Swiss-Prot record:
Keywords: Amino-acid biosynthesis, Aromatic amino acid biosynthesis, Cobalt, Cytoplasm, Lyase, Metal-binding, NAD, Nucleotide-binding, Zinc. This is 3-dehydroquinate synthase. Its cofactor is Co(2+); Zn(2+); NAD(+). Zn(2+) binds at E187, H250, H267. It catalyses: 7-phospho-2-dehydro-3-deoxy-D-arabino-heptonate = 3-dehydroquinate + phosphate. GO terms for cellular component: cytoplasm. The gene is aroB. NCBIfam families: aroB. HAMAP family: DHQ_synthase (MF_00110). Pathway: Metabolic intermediate biosynthesis; chorismate biosynthesis; chorismate from D-erythrose 4-phosphate and phosphoenolpyruvate: step 2/7.
């Protein structure tokens, strides 16, 4: 069932997000509709490939494509140059040329790495996103950010490279482990907290349905998240201005991931911590009320997500924050709450004060 199509309007690089439940077997037809030809390399991982590769392969072969698998180890810890080289090896071994393309079948790690491989292999071949986790469906598969991590920071190596299409099948969430599902809900909260107060109300009212993975509630939540992100990306594709709002919760969240070696927290869990801390900081500076801060924190808790920064010395936090991609000469760009559903961007030069407000003092 196709429930909706959302357009990401980027002139000649525009594309559709096709959303539904049980529509994964449409991938071959979709690739034909967007004009793709040649061999399709399906980049996936050892968790997702056993579940969905055959469905994708059969659909692609019915549409007349040659299909080759490139299967990687699973986990954020593998989002690095060594694993990226495994993708290149698979593409070279299969003799992919510039008339071929990549299907990114998996979560955010697969989408980011496969997208970066597509951007750089033979100086660029097309790719299609098939996100199978909630987090990747509402965030990383839309907008063209691709890349890998560096030992000193998250997503420090990458490129903006738009897919030809995105196919979202919320039925793939049925096989998603609970913790990863909750992690995706954390990223959804972001959109309501700083961009759409009505959507935040929806999340508060439908938290139980979302936790139960109700298909109708999920399609609404994923669709609204994608529509919000598509609008922001259309206004600011390369994060030169308003798109930075999508980093709400990510500044401290990325620091948490870096300090814990990408092993203790899932991305959405780290973002949830970052959002709560951003709301506390916003209340401290008078940008939002205590009631607004409490609503954000209560929704994060209701969705089973963490709220507190892990204990590390302030100097380690400062070091991690100093490598954030939003650092400029005038300080760290921090996304704050301006009530519920609105935001303001602040340049913070005193990282020590920021950490003290968040409970990490000397």
């Amino acid at each position: 069932m196709i429930a909706e199509k959302i357009r990401v309007a980027l002139d000649e690089r525009s594309y559709d997000i096709e959303m539904g439940a049980g529509n994964l077997d449409r991938i071959g037809s979709l690739c034909r509709e967007v004009g793709l030809s040649g061999t399709a390399a399906v980049v996936s991982n050892t968790t997702v490939a056993p579940l969905y590769y055959e469905t994708v392969r059969l659909s692609m072969e019915r549409a007349g494509y040659r299909v080759v698998p490139v299967t990687l180890p699973d986990g954020e810890g593998y989002k690095n140059s060594a694993t990226l080289n495994l993708i290149y090896d698979g593409l070279v071994d299969a003799s992919l040329d510039r008339g071929s393309f990549i299907l990114a079948l998996g979560g955010g790690v697969i989408g980011d790495m496969a997208g970066f491989a597509a951007a750089s292999y033979l100086r660029g071949i097309p790719f299609v996103q098939i996100p199978t986790t909630l987090l990747s469906q509402v965030d990383s598969s839309v907008g063209g950010k691709t890349g890998i991590n560096h030992p000193r920071g998250k997503n420090l190596i990458g490129a903006f490279y738009q897919p030809k299409a995105v196919l979202i099948d919320v039925a793939t969430l049925d096989t998603l482990p609970k913790r990863e599902f909750l992690s995706g809900l954390g990223e959804i909260v972001k959109y309501g907290a700083v961009l759409d107060g009505g959507f935040f109300d929806f999340l508060e009212k439908n938290a139980k349905l979302l936790l139960a993975r109700d298909k109708e509630a999920l399609i609404q939540a994923v669709s609204r998240s994608c529509a919000i992100k598509a609008k922001v990306v259309a206004e600011d594709e390369r994060e030169g201005g308003v798109r930075a709002v999508l980093n709400y919760g990510h500044t401290l969240g990325h620091a948490v991931e870096t300090l814990t070696g990408y092993t203790r927290y899932l991305h959405g869990e780290a973002v949830a911590i970052g959002m709560v801390q951003a709301a506390r900081l916003s209340q401290h500076y008078g940008f939002c009320s205590q009631a607004d801060r409490e609503r954000i924190e209560a929704l994060v808790v209701a969705l089973g997500l963490p709220t507190e920064l892990p204990s590390f010395p302030p100097q380690q936090y400062r070091e991690a924050l100093s490598h954030d991609k939003k650092v400029r000469d005038k300080g760290l760009l921090f996304i704050c709450n301006q009530g519920i559903g609105a935001y303001r961007m602040e340049r913070l030069t005193d990282l020590g004060a920021l950490l003290e407000i968040c409970g990490i003092g000397e």
